[in-house]
Amino acid sequence: MSPQTETKTGAGFKAGVKDYRLTYYTPDYQVSETDILAAFRMTPQPGVPAEECGAAVAAESSTGTWTTVWTDGLTQLDRYKGRCYDLEPVPGESNQYIAYVAYPIDLFEEGSVTNLLTSIVGNVFGFKALRALRLEDLRIPPAYSKTFWGPPHGIQVERDRLNKYGRPLLGCTIKPKLGLSAKNYGRAVYECLRGGLDFTKDDENVNSQSFMRWRDRFLFCAEAIYKAQTETGEVKGHYLNATAGTCEEMYKRASFAAQIGVPIIMHDYLTGGFTANTSLAMYCRDNGLLLHIHRAMHAVIDRQRNHGIHFRVLAKTLRMSGGDHLHSGTVVGKLEGEREVTLGFVDLMRDAYVEKDRSRGIYFTQDWCGMGGTMPVASGGIHVWHMPALTEIFGDDACLQFGGGTLGHPWGNAPGAAANRVASEACVQARNEGRDLSREGGDVIREACKWSPELAAACEVWKEIKFEFETIDKL
């Protein structure tokens, strides 16, 4: 630890400004098992030493400020300060570093993602000495993660409630996302569910607009769910978006969903906020509702490689805040997502223990200590030809959602749903028989087309559709 002579009561107070690195850069520090660890991608301004910038990040996100203050002498600074304990240059970049910072657990309120992020990604991101700053990863120690409830129910409980095992769940976002009346919206839900999907979904910006108020939508969707369940003998659901302008209104919508007996609701956790999300997760846990989480606004925060917060951090904090599902990208669809990076944060969402693996962007070993898992949701520009890759990439514990890939079927919504269900079951069967979907996936789909005219029609419509653009956020 660096000496703090000027801030200890016995040494007296010395006013003035000093380098951050004299106090907050501690390369000899031995990390404690209870420390919260952060990895920042840091780009200093020209002429600013990396050690000074790393120390500034540690200081400004914990106990420090720009000048010495006399009240430093009234606290145990060595106990509470953040420490930049390691720096490593980023390969291939001339002035970029990974700064590792350790934060004492006592700096953070128990069970509060809001407080955690307010400290770690607060004012420091506007610090002038930094050209850019990105939070790449967090290590949440068991001593802190055990103060969070996590997902309302988790993957296994959801499987048991749905009585569906051994395959990915299938969903569909109702389109057009805005403009339908509640009755027509409910009709689309019914057709998709009776066609073979497990879930349908409100889009992220479906709340309670003049063309479709939330209560009407909830009632018509519930009617569709019950009718489809009766016809198919399967448990069905629709993600009813409870996101609202106030927490009181959000609770009202969640309560109504519970009263009419639907199995799952939805929340936009970034636009709605972590405090609202944690509160809603607790309500869902107490009232038997599954909670689907949409990540609207995430790309504003995580898409740029050099500045912001990586999605793996947003995924970790959502698991702590509470969510049974979370949109995670597709790798193969229309939305940003590199394969190894995506697989890394998918594991962080649903596995109990994840080893450090820099090849997948995982900077720290993460032990969730029994916290329930969050199911990844692949959604955005996917269709039946993507099914082999999605099955191979995500495995069984995922929800694959085909919006346009269901509702765009030339024969209608129910045939579109049937095409996706047939494609999924064909891929799962082929995988279980030992076939390599990465090489034989196209053949598997073509074989299934022989006994499913719905799938054959879907394959013909989308045979030329690809989204091949270079990924911006790479390792």
From Swiss-Prot:
Arranged from A to Z, the UniProt key words for this protein are: Calvin cycle, Carbon dioxide fixation, Chloroplast, Disulfide bond, Lyase, Magnesium, Metal-binding, Monooxygenase, Oxidoreductase, Photorespiration, Photosynthesis, Plastid
For the protein in the UniProt heading, the enzyme class is: lyase
| Entries under SUPFAM superfamilies matching the protein | RuBisCo, C-terminal domain (SSF51649), RuBisCO, large subunit, small (N-terminal) domain (SSF54966)
Please list the reactions this protein catalyses: 2 (2R)-3-phosphoglycerate + 2 H(+) = D-ribulose 1,5-bisphosphate + CO2 + H2O; D-ribulose 1,5-bisphosphate + O2 = 2-phosphoglycolate + (2R)-3-phosphoglycerate + 2 H(+)
Chain sites annotated for binding Mg(2+): 201, 203-204
Annotated substrate binding sites? 123, 173, 177, 295, 327, 379
A single Gene Ontology CC annotation of this entry is:
chloroplast
Q: Where in the sequence is N6-carboxylysine found?
A: 201
Where does the entry annotate site (Transition state stabilizer)?
334
The EC number(s) given in the record are: 4.1.1.39
UniProt key word GTP-binding:
no
Intracellular or extracellular location(s): Plastid, Chloroplast
Cofactor(s) listed in the protein's UniProt record: Mg(2+)
Q: PROSITE patterns under this entry?
A: RUBISCO_LARGE (PS00157)
Q: How is it modified after translation?
A: The disulfide bond which can form in the large chain dimeric partners within the hexadecamer appears to be associated with oxidative stress and protein turnover.
Recite the UniProt cofactor note for this protein.
Binds 1 Mg(2+) ion per subunit.
Can you supply a Gene Ontology BP term from the record? Answer: photorespiration
Its Gene Ontology molecular function terms?
A: magnesium ion binding; monooxygenase activity; ribulose-bisphosphate carboxylase activity
- Assembly information from the UniProt record: Heterohexadecamer of 8 large chains and 8 small chains; disulfide-linked. The disulfide link is formed within the large subunit homodimers.
Biological role stated in the UniProt entry: RuBisCO catalyzes two reactions: the carboxylation of D-ribulose 1,5-bisphosphate, the primary event in carbon dioxide fixation, as well as the oxidative fragmentation of the pentose substrate in the photorespiration process. Both reactions occur simultaneously and in competition at the same active site.
What other comment is given for this protein?
Answer: The basic functional RuBisCO is composed of a large chain homodimer in a 'head-to-tail' conformation. In form I RuBisCO this homodimer is arranged in a barrel-like tetramer with the small subunits forming a tetrameric 'cap' on each end of the 'barrel'.
The entry's protein name is Ribulose bisphosphate carboxylase large chain
UniProt gene name: rbcL
